Amino acid sequence: MSQVPEDLKYTRNHEWVRVEADGSVTVGITEHAQESLGDLVFVEPPEAGTQVQAEEACAVVESVKAASDVYAPISGEVTQGNEALADNPEAVNTDPYGDGWIMRIQPADTSEIDGLLDAAAYQELVADEG
C-alpha cells in the first residue's frame, strides 16, 4: 500500500491537500498516482493568479507512459506553481508529499476542504480500485 499521510486531505482524482498556517493549501498528486504514472518527465503547474474551480483540470503531469490532468481540489486563486518541477519533474516521484508539490491555492471557500477525503477514506478508495 502506498504511503497515505494522516494529516492530509485527498480527492477521488488522487490529489492531496495540505492546509498551511496562512490558510492557503498546497496541492500535489498522491504516491499512488505517481506510482501508477511511472517516471515523470514533465510537469506543467498553473501560473500564479490563475482562478481555478473545484474538480477542474488545471495542471498536467506527463510520464513515459501517459499524460494526466491534475484537478483543483477546491476553488480559489493559484498563488504559486512549483516552478522547480520544470527542471526536476522526478521530485513528484521521489517526494510526492514534499518537494513534489504542484501548486498552492488561496481557497475561495474553505468549507470545500471539509468535503475532501481523510486518509482512511482515501485508502479505502485506492483499495476498491484494486
UniProtKB/Swiss-Prot annotation:
InterPro entries: 2-oxoA_DH_lipoyl-BS, Biotin_lipoyl, GCV_H, GCV_H/Fam206, GCV_H_sub, Single_hybrid_motif. Its cofactor is (R)-lipoate. Binds 1 lipoyl cofactor covalently. One of its GO terms (cellular component) is glycine cleavage complex. PROSITE patterns: BIOTINYL_LIPOYL, LIPOYL. Keywords: Lipoyl. It comes from the Bacteria. Disulfide bonds: none annotated. One of its GO terms (biological process) is glycine decarboxylation via glycine cleavage system. The modification N6-lipoyllysine is found at residue 65. Residues 24-106 form the Lipoyl-binding domain. Pfam families: GCV_H. Belongs to the GcvH family. The glycine cleavage system is composed of four proteins: P, T, L and H. The glycine cleavage system catalyzes the degradation of glycine. The H protein shuttles the methylamine group of glycine from the P protein to the T protein. This is Glycine cleavage system H protein. It comes from Halorhodospira halophila (strain DSM 244 / SL1).
